[in-house]
Amino acid sequence: MAGEIPDLVALERTGTGKGAARQARRDGMVPGIVFGGDNEPLPIQIPFNRLLKMLKAGRFKSTLFNLKVEGHEDVRVICRDVQRDVVKDLPTHLDLMRLRRTSRIKLFIHVDFVNHAAAPGLKKGGVLTVVRPEVELEVTAGDIPESITVDLTGLNIGDVVTISSVTLPAGAKPTVERDFVIANISAPSGLAASAAEEEDEEGESEE
């Protein structure tokens, strides 16, 4: 998301506590709180339908927003939590944290896989097994990437993609030091089964 910062428009919530939050929900709003920085926590509310649309669009929690609340200066925020109804799975409350563009934060970033047709292993019927569809990275708040890209060109059956083999966006680094696996290309089940049978036959002949 190293481009234009999208606006998140909210209203200041006059009341606080569970009663005020319930009233906000009855009015078709989702209550929330803005915290962090040098200012006091700010109770807010966002129209339910608007928030739901943004959540369905994806990557809401890995997007830096320009929060606009009437009567307050615009501030950059990131969502730290969205509470949901346990039955309906609909948003009931959200927590936003104030940030500076230079702040370092940890976020889960989506992994995109490209050039499937250029992977010999997939052409032979191999299966791309994604171990981590998202990777936690430490990034700068003003330069949050939409995704990281894994190039499958030249990969064969049995090849493994680790974090060290991926080119990360400038300023981003994994939160885990070990060289963890992101994906691999495994043999199709039929080929794997025949290989296992061949190994069994070889073992029997040696006996």
Swiss-Prot record:
State any single GO MF term: 5S rRNA binding
GO cellular component annotations, sorted alphabetically? cytosolic large ribosomal subunit
The lineage's top-level taxon is: Bacteria
Gene3D superfamilies found in the cross-reference section: Ribosomal protein L25, beta domain, Ribosomal Protein L25, Chain P
Name any Gene Ontology BP term: translation
Question: Per its UniProt record, what NCBIfam families does this chain match?
Answer: bL25_bact_ctc, PRK05618.1-2
Q: How does it assemble?
A: Part of the 50S ribosomal subunit; part of the 5S rRNA/L5/L18/L25 subcomplex. Contacts the 5S rRNA. Binds to the 5S rRNA independently of L5 and L18.
Q: What is this protein called?
A: Large ribosomal subunit protein bL25
Organism equals: Ruegeria pomeroyi (strain ATCC 700808 / DSM 15171 / DSS-3) (Silicibacter pomeroyi)
